UniProtKB/Swiss-Prot annotation:
One of its GO terms (biological process) is photosynthesis, light reaction. The gene is ndhK. GO terms for cellular component: chloroplast thylakoid membrane. It is a peripheral membrane protein. It catalyses: a plastoquinone + NADH + (n+1) H(+)(in) = a plastoquinol + NAD(+) + n H(+)(out); a plastoquinone + NADPH + (n+1) H(+)(in) = a plastoquinol + NADP(+) + n H(+)(out). Keywords: 4Fe-4S, Chloroplast, Iron, Iron-sulfur, Membrane, Metal-binding, NAD, NADP, Plastid, Plastoquinone, Quinone, Thylakoid, Translocase, Transport. Belongs to the complex I 20 kDa subunit family. InterPro entries: NADH_UbQ_OxRdtase-like_20kDa, NADH_UQ_OxRdtase_20Kd_su. Its EC number is 7.1.1.-. This is NAD(P)H-quinone oxidoreductase subunit K, chloroplastic. Gene3D superfamilies: 3.40.50.12280. It is found in: Plastid, Chloroplast thylakoid membrane. Its cofactor is [4Fe-4S] cluster. It is an enzyme of class 7 (translocase).
Length: 243
């Protein structure tokens, strides 16, 4: 039982018909209305996560047929604008990169450089089987990167050949849930120069030896071991052709 404020006087007494003034009020009190319009009770982590999860700006990195499925999201049928996605052409304005398609050895340095130019915090969605494992090119192709997670850290894996637009939307929703549960202090910032490739790709990290002035620019080079194997294979193939 509550008393409505209009039934009180300055002398802290009730009016003559006060016996009928008591009722169950279904409305919130005047104090609660004032507080809810001026005060937000939350934590810094929740506020920062809330501000980021609904305004993801993706950098579209399409290298194969999977990107055609992502292009379907731009149309009115799926309309990815309702999720706050704003495609950007510059990595310095994006906080999400979607790798769609096969990643080759020559494209690996460019992908890593694009990821480094993105501001923190940043996220990665690996879209398609070719991006995640190399796909059908991983068995007999020495120029295919067998998993983009060997180059850059991946947050969401989206399998499929190719994935449907509905699956892409589901991956974005899962990424938003992951962002909502993050803790700001535990978010690890990627150190400059860190790489995620493994020795399975026979990558070595060297400075540019052609021009001593460009010591700060780094490139990927194929190791001598891999080059030797490829040379022996090509020579053996040519000898068989001559026979």
């Amino acid at each position: 039982m509550v008393l409505n404020f209009k039934f009180f006087t300055c002398e802290n007494s009730l009016e003559d018909n006060s016996t009928t003034m008591l009722k169950n009020s279904i409305e919130s009190s005047f104090i609660n209305k004032t507080l809810t319009n001026s005060i937000i009770l939350t934590t810094f982590n929740d506020f920062s996560n809330w501000a980021r999860l609904s305004s993801l700006w993706p950098l579209l990195y399409g290298t194969s047929c999977c990107f055609i499925e992502f292009a379907s999201l731009i149309g009115s049928r799926f309309d990815f604008d309702r999720y706050g996605l704003v495609p950007r052409s510059s990595p310095r304005q994006a906080d999400l990169i979607i790798t769609a398609g096969t990643v080759t050895m020559k494209m690996a340095p460019s992908l890593v450089r694009l990821y480094e130019q993105m501001p923190e915090p940043k996220y990665v969605i690996a879209m398609g089987a070719c991006t995640i494992t190399g796909g059908m090119f991983s068995t007999d192709s020495y120029t295919t990167v067998r998993g983009v997670d060997k180059l850059i850290p991946v947050d969401i894996y989206l399998p499929g050949c190719p994935p449907k637009p509905e699956a892409i939307i589901d991956a974005i929703i899962k990424l938003r849930k992951k962002i909502a549960q993050e803790i700001y202090e535990e978010k690890k910032i990627l150190k400059k120069g860190t790489r995620f490739f493994t020795l399975n790709h026979q990558f070595n990290f060297f400075s540019n030896l052609d021009n001593p002035k460009l010591t700060s620019s780094n490139q990927f080079f194929q190791s001598k071991k891999t080059s030797k194997v490829l040379l022996e294979t090509s020579l053996t193939f040519k000898e068989k052709e001559n026979l």
